[in-house]
Amino acid sequence: MPSAFVLLNTQIGREENIIRDLKNLEEVKEVFRVYGVYDIIAKVESGTMDKVKETITWKLRNLKGVKSTLTLIVTK
């Protein structure tokens, strides 16, 4: 199944709200809060790579408090 890991950089204090919102998205299978340059890692899976890209572009990147993302497409 097509998937990607998305590293999210968030506004300070918005992490828990973003994690809650991510867990409510059907395409998001796992969410981790991490320390370092990025604050959250989300695993996105869907039936097609186009749907994965659409989810990242229109859902994850538009969540309130998300400052930037880095997407890692899984190849195998």
Give the ranges of each region predicted by the language model.
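A compositional/biophysical signature of low hydrophobicity enriched in polar/charged and small residues
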Residues: 1-76
